[in-house]
């Protein structure tokens, strides 16, 4: 495999990737975009979509990572960030969630779909209470 600065060429098409339920949240399905493999785990990217009829638990949590960006492609989602309040993200909205920020997903539309990019690809999540 050819590598450029530790990265391999990678392309993912919507009609060849499968959504899987095995992810961080049971009310979402995840489709990996191959970025984790192409970067040896330095970055991760996946499409996340809502499982219709399932709702968020609204639990406060934070992630131990260096970068996390969310871009909504369809539907809407309401996040609450500690010290930043509630924010409605709609199709076209983008949020950078700084490392360690406490947040929770309060509710979402059944047609929610978003792209999440993280560094690194694998990271730990801590369940936390709000302060």
Q: Where are the predicted features?
A:
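Short acidic-glycine-tyrosine-enriched beta hairpin
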Residues: 83-100
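A generic "binding-loop/recognition-motif" signal
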Residues: 65, 85, 101-102, 110-111
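A generic structural motif
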Residues: 80-82, 106
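A short glycine-rich, His/Asp/Glu-containing loop-to-beta-strand
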Residues: 18-61, 66
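Short, conserved beta-strand element in jelly-roll/cupin
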Residues: 47-50, 62-79, 117-120
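Flexible, glycine-rich phosphate/dinucleotide-binding loops
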Residues: 39, 78, 123-124
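Double-stranded beta-helix
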Residues: 2-13, 104-131
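Hydrophobic/aromatic beta-strand elements that line small-molecule binding cavities or substrate pockets
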Residues: 46-49, 93, 103
């Amino acid at each position: 495999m050819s590598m450029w600065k530790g990265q391999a060429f990678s392309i993912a098409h919507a009609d060849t990737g499968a959504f899987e339920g095995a992810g961080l949240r049971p009310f979402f399905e995840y489709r990996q975009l191959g970025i984790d493999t192409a970067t040896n785990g330095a970055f991760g990217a996946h499409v996340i979509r809502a499982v219709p009829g399932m709702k968020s638990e609204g639990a406060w949590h934070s992630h131990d990572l260096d970068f996390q960006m969310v871009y909504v492609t369809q539907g809407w989602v309401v996040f609450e960030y500690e010290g930043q309040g509630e924010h409605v993200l709609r199709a076209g909205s983008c949020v950078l969630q700084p490392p360690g920020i406490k947040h929770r997903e309060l509710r979402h539309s059944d047609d929610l779909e978003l792209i999440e990019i993280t560094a690194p690809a694998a990271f730990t999540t801590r369940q936390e209470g709000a302060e």
